[in-house]
Amino acid sequence: GQLIASAVVWAFIYWVKPLGDHMTFTIVNPFIKDSYLYIGAIAMFIFIALVMVGSSNAVNITDGLDGLVIVPVMIVALVLGIVSYVTGNTIWSKYLNLYYIHGVGELTVYLSTMIGAGLGFLWYNFYPAQIFMGDTGSLTLGGVLATVAIFLKQELLLAIVGIVFVIEALSVIIQVWSFKKRGKRVFAMAPIHHHFELQGMPETKVTARFWIITLMFAILGILILKLR
């Protein structure tokens, strides 16, 4: 399913070419203005698949404590919403030296509804949770964030702002690799939020600190676009 979704996204940018021929199959460097790497159609499909599969599964892995995943998802959606509005506005995109994409500002509306729905979900998902997201919700939300980032040419920015998702996924990869190669575990338990729990940190404290980390990197992501 994730690869099919990746193929659909790739086909869309291949035929629609919202950024024109010269930018369709490129990766944009968010740290440097006017810095991008052309990788071609085939490599772009592989890259899109990695982003889609990585994002959806990373968000899914993070969904292990009450309220842990939905707030970072909303924060990332907020940042992408700001970027989509700026990118779809000729004046602001020129001011920040971002590539203008016609009509992409409509994604701001979609992301806003996503944030609103997330707040409603958080009302009942905060500790002690009454409802749970499940794989259907977490995989979908991760895929949505990846799709929006791909349309905005901000895949690397997604990795920065969604640093909590990256850390959670890496903790699982490191744990599995270490156990298979060395016969030893790096963490008491993976994903890493369970490691902190086993170290004696209350669930609510783990959740709150992950929220704070996401907020810090969200601010960093916005500053990167302005100060680069």
Where are these regions (language model features)?
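Membrane-interface loop-to-helix entry segments
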Residues: 1-4, 66
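PP2C/PPM family metal-dependent serine/threonine protein phosphatase catalytic domain
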Residues: 29-38
